[in-house]
Curated annotation (Swiss-Prot):
This is Ribosomal protein uS12 methylthiotransferase RimO. Residues 143-371 form the Radical SAM core domain. Disulfide bonds: none annotated. GO terms for cellular component: cytosol. Its cofactor is [4Fe-4S] cluster. Its main location: cytoplasm.
Amino acid sequence: MVSKSAALVSLGCAKNLVDSESMVSQLIELGYEMTPEVSQAALILVNTCGFLESAVRESIDTVLQLAGYKASGSCEKLVVAGCMVQRYGKKLLGLLPEVDLFLGTSHCHALKSFIRDHEAGSSERLRIAFPDHVDNGADRHLVEGRSSAYVKIAEGCGNRCAFCLIPRLRGPYRSRRAVDILREAHRLVACGAKELNIVAQDTTAFGSDRGEEHALVSLLESLEEIEKLEWVRLLYAYPDRITPELIRTMSQSRKVVPYLDIPLQHCVPRILASMGRSGTDPERIVDAIRSGIPGVALRTSLIVGFPGETEADFQALTAFVECTGFEHLGVFAFSPEPGTRAARMPDRVPPDVAQERRKVLLELQRGISRRRLESLVGRVLPVLVEGFHPETDLLLTGRLAVQAPEADGTVLITDGIGTPGEIMRCRVTAAHDYDVEAELLSAS
């Protein structure tokens, strides 16, 4: 075992992964050598999710499992960071005595100094404050040869959705400087990234905290100029802020892929108003995007079982999903998170009813997804080749431009010689519920 080795376990969303890479950079600066094996690490860093209670349970279970390495003596220091720490703070000190250091989202950028203080004899275990820091990305650890990467363009959230804790966990909306984002993007491409996925709690609010009207459009136009960057993907786009200018920019771009992730949450006006999203008109937004961006793939997320949702409301939502035919769909049963307005609302839908509604929508979406993918069979399309299949070296895997990393399906490459990290032409030969099979033809 390396005398000063460290391992990372990153839970939750892509935005958390960006924070994790920043903390890894700080560990490397302290002299740690990163290892993928937690059993060989002297220091284990866990970046947690605290958005939903189910995610909190997963985070706690993970920490307790990793604490076993402290008991066995292989791990000297267990560090827990992120949203769960920001949400529960001091309560975790007694709940998880095995943990040496806790950092909220407010202090992830200061991991290095916290470890140094601890090694110098400090007995402080928790650092947490109201999140107001904006990371410029300069210290983010970049992995050589990775074909796809995330770029976080803002911190926090300025929306006040009734069901959501993000403003409390992440603070107010704070845009990064465009110059810092572009510098990071250039570094990622220089390290081998062909695809950059733009993330934030709300990407379409970029620049609004500074009074900038078309900051996101300007950023996308600047990313367009980066040589060797092939694909730019926009995730977490708040529906109300998808402007005609953004749609036009995407439709005219050579690099921004025809893909939008728009979390609509529901389609019934009364439910949307109760959620704190009364300005959203889902049908109008979807129609504007589909008419303005040819061949666009849409991903959305929906919440079923929100307080006050009747059977008629759910039937309206089902009809909306069937009519709209989203390429990708995530469905969540309402979770009454303590501290949110929604947790105090009357007319609670029984959890078993909410779960059944979720199953109905997911089954409906399974058929929609398969029909969408079957329409691609026989077409020749570019594929980002990502590497060998996790279960066999006989298959390569990749993604189409209409498939986001981790969230959507994949391309199973059954024939042809491919180069991981390259975008190559393929012919789609078969479709499944969420994945397609394809044969590689040549480089695009």
